[in-house]
Amino acid sequence: MKLIKPTLSIILSSILLINPLLAHHSAIAFDKSKTVTVSGVIARSVWRNPHMAINMNAEDDDGNQILWKIEGPGTTILSGQGFNKKMLMDATKNKEEITVVVHPLRSGKPGGLLQGITLANGDSYQVGEEYQDPS
């Protein structure tokens, strides 16, 4: 009987703590051996942790509009590279054309893991993991 309360406490704590871990995922969906550069107009963006996100409309080789879904690093990493929420929200509100460099999805669908972004005013930011200072 003495072990029931501690055991239940451990089980309940584990259940509560595992949920945030399940929300985060690996980058295995992205092909880190390749990079793709895509230009298009921002349709939507989200500035949040654990990842920021950009949806952008880009033209394919036939002139068709394709929605690209871009996942980026967390907001702390972005801010550390000089890229901030106001920049992203202003670009989204103004429906600016941006250029992104991404590791593409392995599935071939239009999307990728953000490595760099160039805004309409020409400002560029390298935000991918290979640009992060490990110190």
Spans of model-derived segments:
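Positively charged n-region of N-terminal signal peptides that target proteins for export
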Residues: 1-6
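Bacterial N-terminal signal peptides
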Residues: 7-20
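Short boundary/loop segments of OB/S1/cold-shock single-stranded nucleic-acid-binding domains
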Residues: 22-36, 91
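Conserved hydrophobic positions within beta-strands
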Residues: 38-42
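Short aromatic-glycine-enriched beta-strand elements
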Residues: 48-58
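Short, basic/aromatic beta-hairpin or loop at an interaction surface
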Residues: 66-78
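Short nucleic-acid-contacting surface segments enriched for D/E, G, S/T with interspersed K/R
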Residues: 80-99
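OB-fold/S1-family single-stranded nucleic acid-binding modules
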Residues: 103-129
